[in-house]
């Protein structure tokens, strides 16, 4: 599976699920229950994907990529499987953000 992120939302490409379109997606910046900073992807009120980003600078860098260079700015994050633990996902995001900030 692969997450494609742009300023309008997220497209999830996977062999098991249909393509998710940006208008079906909502982001949340934190979980109200415990104020934990997260980037969560909801599709039709189902939490499809959630990544804790506890580092505020990294979270802001990541979110700024969604707006960089307008709507043609797309960030692809390849995922071998959706069943990553939070530490593994954190590392994937760190690498993806670093690569995209260099461009």
What are these regions (language model features)?
Residues 1-29:
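Conserved beta-hairpin
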Residues 3, 39, 75:
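A broad, low-specificity signal marking well-ordered, structured residues that form hydrophobic/aromatic
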Residues 13-16, 42-46:
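Secondary-structure transition/turn motif
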Residues 21, 36, 50-52:
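Generic domain-boundary/flexible-linker signal
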Residues 32-42:
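Short acidic, Gly/Pro-enriched loop/turn segments at secondary-structure junctions
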Residues 46, 51-103:
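Terminal and domain-flanking low-complexity segments
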């Amino acid at each position: 599976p692969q997450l494609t992120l742009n300023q309008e939302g997220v497209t999830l490409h996977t062999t098991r699920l249909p393509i998710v379109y940006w208008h079906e997606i909502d982001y949340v910046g934190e979980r109200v229950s415990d104020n934990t900073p997260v980037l969560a992807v909801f599709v039709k009120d189902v939490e499809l994907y959630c990544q804790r980003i506890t580092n505020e600078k990294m979270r802001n860098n990541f979110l700024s990529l969604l707006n960089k260079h307008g709507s043609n700015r797309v960030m692809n994050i390849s995922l071998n499987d959706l069943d990553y633990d939070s530490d593994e996902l954190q590392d994937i995001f760190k690498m993806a953000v670093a690569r995209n900030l260099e461009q």
